[in-house]
From Swiss-Prot:
It comes from Campylobacter jejuni subsp. jejuni serotype O:2 (strain ATCC 700819 / NCTC 11168). The keyword Iron-sulfur does not apply. Part of the FGAM synthase complex composed of 1 PurL, 1 PurQ and 2 PurS subunits. Keywords: ATP-binding, Cytoplasm, Glutamine amidotransferase, Hydrolase, Ligase, Nucleotide-binding, Purine biosynthesis. The gene is purQ. This is Phosphoribosylformylglycinamidine synthase subunit PurQ. It catalyses: N(2)-formyl-N(1)-(5-phospho-beta-D-ribosyl)glycinamide + L-glutamine + ATP + H2O = 2-formamido-N(1)-(5-O-phospho-beta-D-ribosyl)acetamidine + L-glutamate + ADP + phosphate + H(+); L-glutamine + H2O = L-glutamate + NH4(+). NCBIfam families: FGAM_synth_I (TIGR01737), PRK03619.1 (NF002957). PROSITE patterns: GATASE_TYPE_1 (PS51273). Residues 2-223 form the Glutamine amidotransferase type-1 domain. GO terms for molecular function: ATP binding; glutaminase activity; phosphoribosylformylglycinamidine synthase activity. HAMAP family: PurQ. Its EC number is 6.3.5.3, 3.5.1.2. Pathway: Purine metabolism; IMP biosynthesis via de novo pathway; 5-amino-1-(5-phospho-D-ribosyl)imidazole from N(2)-formyl-N(1)-(5-phospho-D-ribosyl)glycinamide: step 1/2.
Length: 223
């Protein structure tokens, strides 16, 4: 299995993400934002502040040449994971539905956050029980997810909401912390699984999440 991690100017979580996957024995490649072609089974858009989040979060990143490769990967049915700023990029580019607003307190929030697993009928959260409570770090200023009523109904009816905040830290509608697309191949979440990979630092629930992609691709590895 190959994981391509896209690096934009301002990305700051690419090395944490690399560490997490390499800890699982997976080959990774950091792809510069100007590269249009890359070979991967899973594409990850990591956290950070792409292009300084000027205009608004992810507004410029969605136009980067590397996004052409991301779109091509999506058309082939490949897996895509967007973490924090990566989730914002998926929303801005239309690969996932909805939008992000500033946190309702207009402040940057950085803390460990309780989350509820809403759906485990997907590769990403298949290793968790439905309604299981987990903890992951969050660090964002624009994590207030928003969608219109029609989109929210679709997300609910099609089981596309994967994670909810417990309790809500930022005003996100329906407490949404993460969603996926209809094919359950494209995932976006604001919390950072790559920052929860060592028990000595708090927990390693992030590894359990990422491991789902490996099992989906029938990878054999040792822990």
């Amino acid at each position: 299995m190959k994981v391509a991690i896209i690096r934009f100017p301002g990305t700051n979580c690419e090395f944490d993400t690399t560490y997490a996957f390499e800890k699982l024995g997976v080959k990774t490649q950091i792809v510069w934002h100007e590269e249009k072609e890359f070979d991967a089974d899973l594409v990850v858009l990591p956290g950070g502040f792409s292009y300084g989040d000027y205009l608004r979060c992810a507004a410029i990143a969605k136009l980067a040449p590397a996004m052409q490769g991301v779109f091509n990967h999506a058309k082939k049915g490949g897996y895509i994971l967007g973490i924090c700023n990566g989730f914002q990029i998926l929303l801005e580019s239309g690969l996932l539905k909805g939008a992000m607003k500033h946190n309702n307190n207009l402040s940057f929030i950085s803390k460990n956050q309780s989350l509820r697993v809403v759906s485990n009928d997907n590769a990403f959260l298949k290793n968790f029980k439905k309604d299981e409570i987990i903890n992951l770090p969050i660090a964002h200023g624009e994590g207030n997810y928003y969608a219109d009523e029609t989109t929210l109904k679709e997300l609910q009816d099609k089981d596309l909401i994967i994670l909810k905040y417990e309790p809500n830290p930022n005003g996100s509608v329906f407490d949404i912390a993460g969603i996926c697309d209809e094919n359950k191949k494209i995932f976006g979440l604001m919390p950072h699984p790559e920052r929860a990979c060592e028990k000595v630092l708090g927990n390693d629930v992030g590894l359990k999440m990422l491991k789902g992609f490996l099992l989906e691709n029938f990878i054999n590895f040792n822990f």
